[in-house]
């Protein structure tokens, strides 16, 4: 069958493509840049932006399934930029699916869509979107997710996946940022360091996307129009971070900063960044980051296991062993 994927050159996207190719499917990747590696694999690559609705429609014609993994992911930025990419871009994806009669859409969401200002311990998919979000990224993803869920009908079956803190070889986001901050002496434990989270090895995340597609084909009445949490946990966040740091021959993070101070500092940084129009950078702290680094956020994954047949094949210790030291 023919699969179309946005963000195919990204961390998760490449792993989804590998698994699709292993199963014998044809793959078209739609990304903002060309990736020679994908072309060597025999993947058809289209260079395009999610805002280019006509190119998105023409290039996804005659495909059987659409994996939408691309999004603007950042801890800070202009609200309109998040909205343009994550919401308008997803609307363009939905139109392309509808116009081209693509029957299955798998949307990569995030657990952050339900994270507000308090801990989540084993919450399931009945959790509502929070009234107030401290993340422009999470807010835009929640809006997009809701649109994908509502688009599910007899012509197009949709499912949303919420993978949490994906890690593994090839990661250019999570682990590199942690290591860079630590090398500069800027990484501190926020709160008491006992908070627990979900993490997820990238190959397990990719497998869930393939299984979600198969579930849409085989039992659309059960899976269609639903969201599913994905994770391997809970684990203590700072213990996990220190395992990664140790693997890179660096000393552990030991210094702490109280949550309230970090949260207020994040608020000040956001305020002054907004005032001077500084958006395209990685701020040392935001309110959302302070919350994420200090609070529990782990979820119940039983629905993904029951409905999708998803069971993580690679455990966390094995996943950590697969990390490439750079």
Language-model region placement:
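Amphipathic terminal alpha-helices
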Residues: 299-307, 311-326
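Conserved Rossmann-fold NAD(P)-dependent oxidoreductase catalytic core, especially the SDR/UDP-sugar
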Residues: 88, 92-136
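NAD(P)H-binding glycine-rich loop region in Rossmannoid oxidoreductase-like domains
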Residues: 39, 43-88, 96, 116
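Alpha-helical substrate-binding/gating segment
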Residues: 179-187, 197-250
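N-terminal Rossmann NAD(P)H-binding glycine-rich loop of SDR-like oxidoreductase domains
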Residues: 3-23
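Catalytic helix-loop patch of NAD(P)-dependent Rossmann-fold dehydrogenases
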Residues: 119-166
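Glycine-rich "substrate-gating" loop/helix at the edge of Rossmann-like oxidoreductase active sites
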Residues: 134-135, 164-172, 192-204, 231-233
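Terminal hydrophobic/aromatic helix or amphipathic segment near a protein terminus
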Residues: 245-292
């Amino acid at each position: 069958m023919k699969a179309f994927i946005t963000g195919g050159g990204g961390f998760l996207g490449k792993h989804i493509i590998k698994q699709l190719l292993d199963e014998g499917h044809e793959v078209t990747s739609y990304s903002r840049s060309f990736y020679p590696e994908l072309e060597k694999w025999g993947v058809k690559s289209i260079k395009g932006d999610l805002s280019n609705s006509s190119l998105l429609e023409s290039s996804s014609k005659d495909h059987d399934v659409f994996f939408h993994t691309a999004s603007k992911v950042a801890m800070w930025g202009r609200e309109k930029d998040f909205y343009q990419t994550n919401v308008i871009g997803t609307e363009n994806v939905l139109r392309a699916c509808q116009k081209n009669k693509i029957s299955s859409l798998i949307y990569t969401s995030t657990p952050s869509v339900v994270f507000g200002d308090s801990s989540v311990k084993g919450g399931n998919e009945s959790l509502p979107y929070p009234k107030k979000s401290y993340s422009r990224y999470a807010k835009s993803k929640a809006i997009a997710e809701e649109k994908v869920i509502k688009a599910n009908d007899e012509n197009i079956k949709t499912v949303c996946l919420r993978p949490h803190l994906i890690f593994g070889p090839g990661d250019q986001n999570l682990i590199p940022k942690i290591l860079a901050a630590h090398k500069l002496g800027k990484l501190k434990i926020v709160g008491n360091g006992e908070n627990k989270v979900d993490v997820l090895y990238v190959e397990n995340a990719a497998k869930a996307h393939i299984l979600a597609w198969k579930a849409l084909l085989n039992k659309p009445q059960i899976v269609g129009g639903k969201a599913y949490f994905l994770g391997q946990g809970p684990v203590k966040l700072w213990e996990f971070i220190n395992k990664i740091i140790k693997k890179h021959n660096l000393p552990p993070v030991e210094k702490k900063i109280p949550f309230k101070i970090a949260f207020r500092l994040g608020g000040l940084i956001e305020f002054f960044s907004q005032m001077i129009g500084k958006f395209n950078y990685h701020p040392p702290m935001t309110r959302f980051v302070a919350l994420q680094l200090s609070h529990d956020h782990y979820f119940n994954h039983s629905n993904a296991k029951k409905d999708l047949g998803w069971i993580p094949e690679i455990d966390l210790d094995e996943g950590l062993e697969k990390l490439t030291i750079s």
